[in-house]
């Protein structure tokens, strides 16, 4: 009986202790918060996840982040970059996939590393043998310090952009691009042989990428047949004519677009057609 009472008391104490530990488990904010950013590029996207340390009065590069040593490019877990499609990064072809992103800073340049082991805590288990790629870029010095490490995409076009990192007074800039033209052209050839033809989308791609403008004009006019008084189609028809060098045709088309927009009380496309008309007059 005494033994039973002893075990019961022990179990009660254990449960009480575990309950106490459970009550003490609280969630607090991270010193270095995590950010995930996604950027569309071409037909795919780039996803970047990293933790953002702050200066907090410390000397960063050359001390907190030693020169000449592999750095996780942030805090906590190593930075992860994921490409849904093949890209070119600073002239290097990168297959679609997920990579751990590290860097080795010096006063004048950075060694950027893409490692095949994407999920690591810091750089403690980093192995150079797992590197997919290393390349160097110049250090970009800034006169004004930035408290929180920040990475972002800038100067983004349909198929190219820049990935920039900045912290304290230092940083770097990477050029990234993707080649989608062959895919899009093959897709256009395929779908234009079907019953439901996306005339406008095909015309828009030809216009934006300097393809056969006569074909683009033919397609936009075919698309326009479904809505012959559309100021939307008129502005694009006029833009194509203007790019072909047909200023007189562009002016006449844009003026039609202005007329239809006014009839429909569409101030946005009235303004857009007027803008093309003004260019055609110049």
Predicted regions, residues:
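Alpha-helical adaptor scaffolds
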Residues: 185-241, 245-252, 256-260, 266-267
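TPR/TPR-like alpha-solenoid helical repeat scaffolds
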Residues: 239-243, 265-282
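Short N-terminal segments immediately surrounding and downstream of signal-peptide cleavage
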Residues: 24-42
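Bacterial Sec-dependent N-terminal signal peptides
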Residues: 1-25
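Extended, well-structured beta-strand/loop surface patches
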Residues: 45-96, 103-195, 228
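A short structural micro-motif
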Residues: 105-106, 243, 260, 279
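C-terminal alpha-helix/helix-terminus motif
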Residues: 5-8, 12, 261, 277-281
């Amino acid at each position: 009986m005494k033994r039973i009472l002893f075990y019961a008391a022990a179990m009660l104490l254990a449960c009480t202790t575990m309950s106490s530990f459970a009550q003490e488990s609280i969630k607090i904010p991270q010193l270095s918060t995590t950010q995930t950013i996604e950027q569309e590029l071409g037909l795919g996207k780039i996803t970047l996840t990293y933790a953002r340390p702050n200066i907090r009065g410390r000397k960063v590069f050359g001390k907190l982040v030693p020169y000449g040593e592999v750095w996780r490019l942030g805090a906590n877990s190593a930075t992860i970059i994921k490409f849904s499609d093949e890209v070119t990064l600073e002239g290097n072809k990168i297959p679609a996939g997920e990579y751990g992103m590290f860097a080795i800073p010096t006063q004048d340049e950075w060694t950027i590393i893409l490692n095949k082991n994407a999920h690591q805590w810091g750089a403690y288990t980093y192995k150079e043998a797992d590197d997919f790629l290393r390349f160097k870029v110049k250090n970009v010095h800034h006169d004004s310090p930035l408290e929180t490490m920040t990475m972002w995409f800038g100067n983004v076009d349909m198929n190219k952009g820049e990935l920039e990192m900045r912290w304290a007074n230092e940083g770097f800039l990477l050029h990234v691009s993707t080649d989608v033209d062959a895919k899009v052209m093959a897709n256009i050839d395929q779908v234009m042989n079907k019953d439901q033809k996306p005339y406008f989308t095909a015309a828009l791609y030809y216009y934006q990428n300097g393809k056969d403008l006569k074909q683009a004009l033919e397609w936009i006019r075919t698309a326009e047949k479904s809505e012959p008084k559309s100021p939307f189609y008129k502005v694009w028809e006029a833009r194509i004519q203007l790019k072909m060098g047909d200023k007189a045709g562009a002016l006449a088309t844009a003026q039609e677009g202005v007329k239809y927009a006014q009839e429909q009380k569409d101030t946005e496309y009235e303004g857009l057609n007027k803008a093309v008309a003004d260019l055609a007059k110049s």
